[in-house]
Regions:
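Flexible, solvent-exposed loop/hinge segments and secondary-structure transition points
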Residues: 1-131
Length: 131
């Protein structure tokens, strides 16, 4: 089963609250278990490119069923570069996305962009705690 729109909306709201409490302006992407977008949100003042980065991080987390930070070292691997080309360069192998897990099943992922990589991941963690 994949993350639902209702769950995605709850995640977005919690992520926005976490970012706002730190005076951060970020974009948040929630993708399903295949890495396809369910919801993407850009806070007022977040940079124009951050939604795409948030989505790319979330895609990596969902596709590999682990935090995107765990994939950062593999970004230069020829297989990963080919996979990224197959996905039109949308994959972002950097910290800031976490899988959405229910039981033992990955239902999707949340990606955040616009703050430091650690802050992005912390916002994602706070959002997942809302589920």
């Amino acid at each position: 089963m994949s993350v639902t729109l209702r769950q995605a909306q709850k995640i977005l709201k919690a992520a926005e609250a976490s970012a706002a409490s730190q005076s951060l302006k970020v974009s948040i992407a929630v993708v399903d278990n295949r890495g396809d977008p369910v919801a993407i949100y850009r806070m007022d003042g977040a940079r124009h490119f951050t939604p795409d980065i948030a989505r790319g991080k979330a895609m990596v987390s969902a596709m590999f069923q682990q935090p995107s930070a765990a994939m950062a070292e593999r970004a230069t691997n020829p297989v990963m570069q080919t996979l990224n080309q197959m996905n039109l360069g949308r994959l972002v192998f950097g910290q800031g996305a976490l899988p959405i897990v229910k039981g033992n099943e990955v239902q999707g992922a949340i990606g955040v962009s616009g703050a430091t990589s650690q802050q992005d991941e912390d916002i994602a963690k706070a959002a997942l705690a809302s589920l």
